[in-house]
Amino acid sequence: MDIRQVRETVEMIEEQHFDIRTITMGISLLDCIDSDIDRAAAKIYQKITTKAANLVAVGDDIAAELGIPIVNKRVSVTPIALIGAATDAEDYLSLAKALDQAACDIGVDFIGGFSALVQKGYQKGDKILIESIPQALAQTQKVCASVNVGSTRSGINMTAVADMGRIIKETAKASEIGAAKLVVFANAVEDNPFMAGAFHGVGEADTVINVGVSGPGVVKRALEKVRGESFDVLAETVKKTAFKITRIGQLVGQMASERLGVGFGVVDLSLAPTPAVGDSVARVLEEMGLEIVGTHGTTAALALLNDAVKKGGVMACNRVGGLSGAFIPVSEDEGMIAAVQGGSLNLEKLEAMTAICSVGLDMIAIPEETPSETIAAMIADEAAIGVINQKTTAVRIIPKGKEGDMIAFGGLLGTAPVMAVNPHSSADFIARGGQIPAPIHSFKN
């Protein structure tokens, strides 16, 4: 490595807010299934605290060794609905508390997997888990929940969509930040290192390490050097920058997996912002020539960014996965917040942007009087985009306060302006229930 590359790396870390957002250990809990819920909870606690005992220490050692911040260490587990279904319990609070206690004792930032996969219907454990979510998130510190309500192969479970509209409202009432730790997915992935939607898929190995990187500031700085150049140059610049970022992510993942004695899973090629100035995806889009995010051209700029990040990342690492694209969470991105406050960015434009990027309506505050049917309809719209376009989409919305308020969540979750919601009703549409069938192009066998 020549001195120029060394200098570039130092600048990425010190000036451009580059970091490894998360090292996430995925742990299978299938061998913790028990007909007695207390025994199952004890097994879950034991397995997590054994497998991930050294996760935080190893992460800190690697960060010190490489001089690269590793912001979060996290754990994801098998969807708890699968574990709880073997019991006769009427709620899964004790399992959520076992997850939380394990997370607190090993020192990780979050634990994901209080989850259910209901894209084609409910099993016993799914319904119980979903009804447990509001209190599970209110009575724990570090547990994150997710529910997959649709897939390209299965269509959209509209009964579950209606239920989740209500559950999000109940969760927001039960605790201050509970709804910020709850994601509703279509086409959820099994190897996602990012919260709040991470869970460990049943097709995964017993224990794996997945890595998520963060580098919007690095990309913006690179684009500053090619102002006025053509889109070809723009795409190539993003691609080369994503290559560098992903290479570091792969190195960290391999080091962590070797030291922890578990398999290396994937690097998630997502550009994840933080509330810090200089670490914003919105500012990357504006650097491409937009006056402010939300104006015409925003969706095209995001499409270029997303695609170039994937192309560069795939070249850098032979194991990519997770969500892999640009994240556009409103509360976690100072540029997005400014665009909302400036009147340029609204829910409808964000929905259009989600047809391009890797998540969906993410970390968005809406008025607390928003009806649960309207929230369910937002979920249905996002799920439809994902199901038809064969991609992951998600909704993480927080019904709190009234339009124009600022809601502070703290830490990486940031601050969100409460956004206007279309006042017209979707209640009769949501009340139908049942299943929206899978699209014709899903029928490939």
Curated annotation (Swiss-Prot):
NCBIfam families: PRK05313.1. It comes from the Bacteria. InterPro entries: UPF0210. Belongs to the UPF0210 family. Homodimer. Signal peptide: none annotated. This is UPF0210 protein SEQ_0468.
